[in-house]
From Swiss-Prot:
Its EC number is 6.1.1.14. This is Glycine--tRNA ligase alpha subunit. One of its GO terms (biological process) is glycyl-tRNA aminoacylation. Belongs to the class-II aminoacyl-tRNA synthetase family. The gene is glyQ. It is an enzyme of class 6 (ligase). It catalyses: tRNA(Gly) + glycine + ATP = glycyl-tRNA(Gly) + AMP + diphosphate. It comes from the Bacteria. GO terms for molecular function: ATP binding; catalytic activity, acting on a protein; glycine-tRNA ligase activity; transferase activity. Pfam families: tRNA-synt_2e (PF02091). Keywords: Aminoacyl-tRNA synthetase, ATP-binding, Cytoplasm, Ligase, Nucleotide-binding, Protein biosynthesis. Its main location: cytoplasm. HAMAP family: Gly_tRNA_synth_alpha.
Amino acid sequence: MSKKLTFQEIILTLQQFWNDQDCMLMQAYDNEKGAGTMSPYTFLRAIGPEPWNAAYVEPSRRPADGRYGENPNRLYQHHQFQVVMKPSPSNIQELYLESLEKLGINPLEHDIRFVEDNWENPSTGSAGLGWEVWLDGMEITQFTYFQQVGGLATGPVTAEVTYGLERLASYIQEVDSVYDIEWADGVKYGEIFIQPEYEHSKYSFEISDQEMLLENFDKFEKEAGRALEEGLVHPAYDYVLKCSHTFNLLDARGAVSVTERAGYIARIRNLARVVAKTFVAERKRLGYPLLDEETRAKLLAEDAE
């Protein structure tokens, strides 16, 4: 029987595969976020006319999902392997299935289903046509064609493939608990992450200072606005991410009512929309540097008319 891939070998295999498809290998973005989609490497780059092919691992924090390290499949923080390709290759689904083969999962020997699940992220004004990918009855990937990001229509269309690494590793290694996953030879997932899982859960549900978080949300929102007034897209977006994580902490603590919840989401969404518009305008001002010369000249000429 062949040796099963460790967690880090799964990452390395996916990195090599998508590198071979001309994706840039980016690194995780250094702000808390609830999903790889919220990284500027996806959120900002999915809008505007410039091409963008990237792949990266993104630790994703969801305070309300914390379970003190006691639930085998529910986590405060999990890891996503994110692939974004713009424009979307016509064979993106075939490429995805090929990536599974590289991980030792033969599509002809397993029940792999694309289950329609259109995607929406209200807090960033984003939506798209989507599918969950189920492997022998377990969801392992979200597949999305973005239609709107930051309130802006996308064009060309960006394809996003988001692998749930813990689920994928649990399947490949045939373990029932995420904490039994072998991260590297001789080192279990739980030996690395069960302590922070417990501590972050305790903090999110019991210890966090609600008043401080409420004040921070207001301050982060204001600072994002100040940065946008100066045309500083990336600092502004950092504060949008801080607003989002702060809201998630408040939500986990039960500090916001149903009515207030909608209001906070709208405030984050409004900021995200301004960030998106400002980013596109700034890329245009720079002359769309990632476009080829012919397309750039044509677009800039059309915009000038």
